């Protein structure tokens, strides 16, 4: 027993009929044109038969095409309705699951809670007052900047061997005079500097 639905079988039959009508119309039209190209008269019985059959086949093909278009249109409408039904069913399930959120008592209670919270926040701000030090405090304000500057001025730099070597290799200031950047000759009586090593 086939597992195809009746709708599938109907679609298959319609497709087969449409293909057959298309092929039949094409064959009769081609036969008609061949007779004309071969010099047949329009009074020729062969031409009359071929031309009449071609007209009937073309009419049948047009009917099949219109029928297929109407069927497709109806099926599309059905799919649209089914999609709408599924959409509304899903929405209904969600609303039923969360029914308490749309109840009038819940909405009134939520509004009252929001109003109470606003009133309590206002009372809290009134209790704090406008002269509290941290009223307008923001992240890294002037006090934070002053504290960081104090730390930078009072904290000694690290004295690790690595940083000491960096101090020997990297100048602390950049010379403004380009002549200062030229290598200076070593005097004959001056010994070269002894490399500094840690013991």
From Swiss-Prot:
Name by which UniProt lists this protein: Tegument protein UL14 homolog
Pfam families according to UniProt: Herpes_UL14 (PF03580)
Biased composition (Polar residues): 176-191
Cellular component GO terms held in the UniProt record: host cell cytoplasm; host cell nucleus; viral tegument
Localization, UniProt: Virion tegument; Host cytoplasm; Host nucleus
Keyword annotations: Host cytoplasm, Host nucleus, Virion, Virion tegument
Domain of life: Viruses
Region (Disordered) location: 176-199
Keyword Membrane: no
PTM annotation, UniProt: Phosphorylated.
InterPro entries: Herpes_UL14
Function field: Contributes to the nuclear transport of the viral transcriptional activator VP16 homolog during the early phase of infection. Therefore, participates indirectly in the regulation of the immediate-early gene expression. Additionally, seems to be important for efficient nuclear targeting of capsids.
Family the UniProt entry places it in: Belongs to the alphaherpesvirinae HHV-1 UL14 protein family.
């Amino acid at each position: 027993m086939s597992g195809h639905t009746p709708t599938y079988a109907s679609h298959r039959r319609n497709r087969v009929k449409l293909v057959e009508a298309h092929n039949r119309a094409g064959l009769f039209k081609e036969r008609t044109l061949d007779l004309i190209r071969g010099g047949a008269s329009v009074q020729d019985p062969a031409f009359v038969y071929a031309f009449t059959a071609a007209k009937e086949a073309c009419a049948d093909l047009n009917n099949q095409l219109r029928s297929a278009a109407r069927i497709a249109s109806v099926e599309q409408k059905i799919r649209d309705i089914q999609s709408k039904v599924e959409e509304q069913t899903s929405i209904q399930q969600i609303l039923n699951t969360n029914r308490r959120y749309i109840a009038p008592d819940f909405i009134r209670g939520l509004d009252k809670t929001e109003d109470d919270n606003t009133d309590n926040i206002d009372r809290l701000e009134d209790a704090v007052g406008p002269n509290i030090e941290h009223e307008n405090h923001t992240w890294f304000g002037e006090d934070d900047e002053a504290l960081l500057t104090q730390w930078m001025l009072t904290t000694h730099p690290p004295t690790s061997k690595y940083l000491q070597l960096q101090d020997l290799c990297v100048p602390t200031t950049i010379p403004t005079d380009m002549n200062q950047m030229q290598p200076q000759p070593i005097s004959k009586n001056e010994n070269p500097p002894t490399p500094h090593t840690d013991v």
